[in-house]
């Protein structure tokens, strides 16, 4: 799934993964950067463009395919689509919700640098998974987590 409108995030699709993503259906929001579609087409990958619940599609009464709503991140969009497709076991891999112990915001091999967002926001201490220690996060990740938790409660 891709929601972002920027060229820098479209570059995630500018990689050749061979057969690994051959049978993947890439779901992109209607506001996705054109380069993302160009890269998907260039590698003959299947993709679907879905409008988000924004004012312009509502204004022009674009209802034929309905909308994605309450999807501020790829994780939210993926969860929403999984629920609509009646999937029962949904696993999130790689969702940003906390900094690594070394302060990195992303994995070492992240194309925009491991500390891409490390100094972008004020760090906040929060309870780590399992409740045995505290980790650093920031307000945007906490907001994303709260929306995701509300979605899980609503659709479970």
Residues covered by each model-derived region:
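Metal-ion/cofactor- or nucleotide/acyl-coenzyme-handling active-site neighborhoods
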Residues: 1-156
